[in-house]
């Protein structure tokens, strides 16, 4: 399998004027990642996706109905904000992953399509609006995720807890998975809050191997993220823990297997592995497209070392068919 860089490049990019960070203003592309330690030089070359990566794009009435409902209640879905390739499929099945605490992130991760900037104040009505939307859509399993909110004293944990509690009040039989940020510098207070309102699945993505953290997750720490997963499991031993990795940004398969072993050593139960697809030429470049056989090999290895559930395939994403993942069904 070739390791040729097929989109963009990493280097010390020439300096250009950068927009100021102002409250409520979204920064994307170069304006978002320009201050990152590893620079990205944009390219107009568009890599050809292999045959095994096929995404059906559609805009059915059910998709538009969900979008309109989210707009009406001032809610966001990570499906749209992060340009997920599975948006049409999930929306068409009447499911969505909700993104709380706004649509502006305090981090500058170059793989992510969510905007960076100085976020607005939290919407105190969001937990109720979220619960109402879930009830109106008659959902049985939801994923609640968020932007990073390093500006908040609890990292947003209290808002997560309110959303969990309010959603269960409106939908008593609802299953809730949370995909949380790393609560950098605020782990103790965040865990104290979340153990009082635990979800049904606790998910925090490592995203990549530690060697690539500087370029892919500036501001994050590999050991910290592992510790967050371990400590939540200690606080709520009956709640499954979950993490995910994106492949194709320069990692080696043996490095991925080491991360998998690290996750198991920190009592993580579930794992997702998917192909990274760059949202634009200004994002982290795709180094290679990982073959489905390699995803299958990693899934088999995951079960060998004790994961209870592994979803591994080119279009797998952390919240893709999360209900089926939680039920132990095979996802690829």
Swiss-Prot record:
Its cofactor is [4Fe-4S] cluster. It is found in: Cytoplasm. InterPro entries: Aldolase_TIM, Elp3/MiaA/NifB-like_rSAM, LIAS_N, Lipoyl_synth, rSAM. Binds 2 [4Fe-4S] clusters per subunit. One cluster is coordinated with 3 cysteines and an exchangeable S-adenosyl-L-methionine. PROSITE patterns: RADICAL_SAM (PS51918). PANTHER family: LIPOYL SYNTHASE, LIPOYL SYNTHASE, MITOCHONDRIAL. This is Lipoyl synthase. The gene is lipA.
């Amino acid at each position: 399998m070739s390791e040729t860089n097929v989109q963009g490049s990493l280097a010390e990019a020439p300096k250009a004027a950068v927009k100021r960070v102002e409250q409520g203003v979204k920064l994307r592309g170069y304006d978002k990642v320009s201050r990152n330690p590893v620079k990205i030089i944009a390219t107009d070359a568009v890599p050809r996706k292999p045959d095994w990566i096929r995404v059906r794009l559609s805009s059915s009435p059910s998709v538009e109905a969900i979008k309109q409902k989210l707009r009406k209640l001032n809610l966001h879905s990570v499906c749209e904000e992060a340009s997920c390739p599975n948006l049409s499929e999930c929306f068409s099945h009447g499911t969505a992953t909700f993104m709380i605490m706004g649509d502006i992130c305090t981090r500058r991760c170059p793989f992510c399509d969510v905007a960076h900037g100085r976020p607005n104040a939290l919407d105190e009505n969001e937990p109720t609006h979220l619960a109402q939307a879930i009830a109106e859509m008659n959902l049985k399993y939801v994923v609640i995720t968020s932007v990073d909110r390093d500006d908040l004293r609890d990292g947003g944990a209290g808002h997560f807890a309110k959303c969990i509690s309010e959603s269960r009040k409106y939908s008593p039989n609802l299953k809730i998975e949370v995909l949380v940020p790393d609560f950098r510098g605020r782990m103790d207070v965040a865990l104290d809050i979340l153990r009082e309102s635990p979800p049904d699945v606790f998910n925090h993505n490592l995203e990549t191997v530690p060697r690539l953290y500087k370029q892919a997750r500036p501001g994050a720490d590999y050991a910290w993220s592992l510790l967050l997963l371990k400590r939540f499991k200690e606080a709520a031993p009956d709640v499954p823990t979950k993490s995910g990795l994106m492949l194709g940004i320069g990692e080696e398969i043996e490095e991925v297997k080491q991360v998998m072993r690290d996750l198991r050593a920190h009592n993580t139960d579930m794992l997702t592995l998917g192909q990274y697809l760059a949202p634009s030429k200004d994002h982290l470049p795709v180094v290679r497209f990982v073959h489905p056989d390699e995803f299958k090999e990693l899934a088999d290895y995951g079960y060998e070392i004790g994961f209870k559930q592994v979803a591994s395939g080119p279009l797998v994403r952390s919240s893709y068919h999360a209900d089926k993942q939680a039920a132990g069904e095979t996802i690829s």
